[in-house]
């Protein structure tokens, strides 16, 4: 039976049976509108709104079990990963779900002829008037204008669905963008800006002639499974300046001459952030001359490009840091640079995830996410917006590193849960997803106290609270916190929690940077982590007074983060032709990802699969990491928040990588 005939059949049955349209409703989603959208006016009730209803996926109650079956070291199916097609089929909305939602639409006066189902079967599309949409969703639509792009969008702050279909609806969005009044920018006014969720970065300039120790050349390659430190002598001054040598010494990261052809590591950057080729060569010339001229593989998503129009630390520092260290630590493995977003609309994680999974494309939300195709006209020498949409057009690398952190309260819980499920799906396919935890302890990116607590789907003002970061709070990613070599210490000393005060060049402004960590207000503690978080809370209560402004719903029951840590202090980085010291967990994430990439390489050479989602293995075997038991992160009042301790803690997680111990463990697994 065709979809259209099926819809008419439902409509006729409902009409003939005289079902009443007087239904009970419940708020399905309430959202906090981002600050960059400003309300302009009520929408014209006769304006047409394209609505997308994403149908609830099936088997969600089993999703975590599916992931654990391939990532729990005790599972007989460990590392028996699924194909992308198998994942899509397992979670595709069922036919009964579609019928339930269609019955609601029909009872609400929406004729079947006006409803179209997507090819994947996961969405229902309709084009109805604003007045009809408001009646259907028990809401009010307003026109909002984006403060940076001048685009306008129809947005409702909350919407409801009939109670009997609530569990069958994932989310509902309108994709209508009203482009009248779109401002043409001049080349002198491109309005470059940082991607959402990213501060400009933290660095101190370092004169080349102050470089504290000479370049150390590579040693010869050794066997596949054993590590060789770069030089016979250990690097010095790593408490003052981190280099690739320091990281190899700290974490026993190997040096190789070859890598498995199927191995891969991806680094994600969002426009306007991009590396400079001259910076890569400057870095390699100092630390690894044989790599001069090497470049990462480039993959453009939704118009992504390597931005060189506005060279500055804000736009080049992050990408230079990520790619310089990932390439140096994993050479000769090929690194992929995923560049997301065109010059006008930028890009974010949802755009990236949609490029990997065509069933996720409807989840790209115009309130939070850039929408492609981008209709912005060309303004020579600047190009027009990207005139297509990369929906399921790319493949994931085996490890993906992302040095971006958002505040969990920036998005609706429904948005975050839907995105989190995509990370679970990547884990099912054997992909390791690594996120930086953030650099501001339990405060916001601006060092402020949080004032929003999310309870289920409701958002309400609350007393000052700790601010967890997302996606680190998603239980299906590996969150990386920060550490540093203790003052006047060496690479042989145990590291301490990352805690650095950065002072501006004029000495007037200082900022405290500490490893972000804490507990989610949206996601419950996962089973693989439950013992670790319970033990930490017991130690915390026995040794310290609980933080005074810990007014969060997730404390003791929410997903704890970070999971692991790596050095985050004073990375020697070539940026805009200068050598600078860069700080933050932005550095920690690609370092940990590089360790995982080398473990994958060894497993692939033995005919095994990559390690995929590593958290269950690491929490079951914390002894393979270097425990960090000193230091703390800080809150918005510049007071200690959580303390590092033996075992897992919400500052440094389970600790820093020890490649040799981790490798031995993962090679023992099937």
UniProtKB/Swiss-Prot annotation:
It comes from the Eukaryota. Its cofactor is Ca(2+). Ca(2+) binds at residues 627-628, 647, 649. It catalyses: Release of an N-terminal tripeptide from a polypeptide. The active site is at residues 318, 322, 586. GO terms for biological process: proteolysis. Pfam families: Peptidase_S8, Pro-kuma_activ. GO terms for molecular function: metal ion binding; serine-type endopeptidase activity; tripeptidyl-peptidase activity. It comes from Arthroderma otae (strain ATCC MYA-4605 / CBS 113480). Residues 21-231 form a propeptide. PROSITE patterns: SEDOLISIN (PS51695). The gene is SED1. It is an enzyme of class 3 (hydrolase). InterPro entries: Peptidase_S8/S53_dom, Peptidase_S8/S53_dom_sf, S53_propep, Sedolisin_dom, Tripeptidyl-peptidase_I. Its EC number is 3.4.14.10. Secreted tripeptidyl-peptidase which degrades proteins at acidic pHs and is involved in virulence. This is Tripeptidyl-peptidase SED1. Residues 1-20 form the signal peptide. Glycans are attached at residues 334, 387, 488, 508, 551. GO terms for cellular component: extracellular region.
């Amino acid at each position: 039976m065709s979809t259209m005939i099926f819809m008419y059949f439902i409509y006729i049955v409902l009409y003939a049976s005289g079902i009443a349209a007087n239904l009970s409703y419940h708020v399905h989603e309430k959202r906090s509108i981002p600050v960059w959208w400003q309300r302009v006016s009520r929408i014209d009730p006769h304006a047409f709104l394209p609505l997308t209803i994403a149908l609830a996926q099936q088997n969600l109650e089993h999703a975590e079990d599916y992931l654990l079956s391939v990532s729990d070291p005790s599972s007989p199916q460990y590392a028996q990963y699924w194909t992308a097609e198998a994942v899509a089929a397992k979670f595709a909305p069922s036919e009964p779900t579609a019928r339930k939602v269609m019955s609601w639409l029909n009872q609400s006066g929406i004729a079947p002829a006006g409803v179209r189902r997507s090819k994947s079967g996961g969405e229902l599309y309709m084009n109805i008037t604003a007045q009809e949409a408001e009646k259907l969703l028990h809401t009010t639509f307003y026109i909002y204008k984006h403060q940076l792009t001048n685009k306008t969008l129809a947005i409702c702050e909350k919407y409801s669905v009939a109670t009997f279909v609530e569990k069958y609806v994932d989310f509902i969005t309108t994709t209508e963008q009203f482009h009248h009044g779109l401002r043409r920018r001049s080349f002198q006014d491109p309005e470059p800006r940082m991607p959402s969720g990213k501060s400009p970065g933290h660095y101190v300039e370092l004169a080349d002639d102050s470089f504290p120790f000479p370049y150390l050349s590579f040693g010869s390659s050794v066997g596949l499974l054993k590590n060789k430190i770069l030089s016979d002598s250990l690097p010095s001054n790593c408490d003052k300046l981190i280099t690739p040598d320091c990281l190899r010494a700290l974490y026993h990261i190997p040096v190789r001459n070859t890598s498995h052809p199927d191995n891969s590591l991806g680094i994600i950057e969002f426009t306007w952030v991009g590396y400079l080729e001259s910076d890569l060569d400057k870095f390699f010339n100092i630390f690894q001359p044989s790599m001069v001229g090497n470049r990462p593989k480039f993959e453009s998503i939704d118009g992504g490009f390597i931005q060189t129009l506005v060279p500055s630390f804000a736009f080049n520092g992050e990408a230079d840091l990520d790619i310089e260290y990932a390439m140096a630590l994993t050479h000769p493995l090929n690194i992929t640079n995923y560049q997301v977003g065109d010059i006008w609309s930028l890009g974010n994680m949802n755009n990236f995830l949609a490029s990997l999974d065509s069933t996720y494309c409807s989840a790209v939300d115009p309130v939070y996410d850039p929408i492609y195709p981008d209709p912005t006209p060309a303004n020579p020498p600047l190009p027009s917006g990207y005139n297509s949409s990369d929906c399921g057009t790319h493949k994931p690398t085996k490890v993906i590193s992302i040095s971006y952190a958002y505040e969990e309260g920036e998005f609706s819980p429904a948005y975050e849960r839907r995105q989190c499920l995509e990370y679970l799906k990547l884990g099912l396919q054997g992909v390791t997803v690594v996120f930086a935890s953030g650099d501001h302890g339990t405060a916001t990116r601006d060092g402020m106290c949080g004032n929003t607590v999310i309870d289920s789907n409701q958002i309400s003002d609350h007393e000052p609270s700790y601010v967890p970061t997302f996606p680190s709070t998603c239980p299906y990613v590996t969150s990386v916190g920060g550490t540093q070599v203790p003052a006047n210490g060496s690479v042989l000393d145990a590291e301490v929690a990352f805690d650095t005060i950065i002072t501006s060049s004029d000495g007037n402004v200082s900022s405290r940077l500490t490893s972000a960590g804490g507990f989610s207000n949206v996601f419950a503690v996962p089973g693989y982590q439950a013992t670790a978080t319970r033990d930490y809370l017991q130690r915390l209560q026995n040794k310290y007074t609980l933080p005074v402004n810990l007014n969060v719903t997730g404390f003791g029951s929410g997903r704890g983060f970070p999971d692991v840590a790596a050095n985050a202090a004073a990375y020697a980085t070539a940026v805009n032709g200068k050598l600078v010291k860069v700080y933050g967990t932005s550095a920690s994430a690609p370092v940990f990802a590089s360790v995982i990439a080398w473990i994958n390489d060894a497993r692939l050479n033995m005919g095994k699969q990559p390690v995929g989602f590593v958290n269950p293995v690491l929490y079951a075997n914390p002894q393979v990491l270097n425990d960090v038991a000193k230091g703390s992160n800080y809150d918005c009042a510049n007071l200690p928040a959580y303390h590092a301790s033996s075992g897992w803690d919400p500052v440094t997680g389970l600790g820093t990588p020890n490649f040799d111990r981790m490798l031995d463990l993962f090679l023992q697994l099937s």
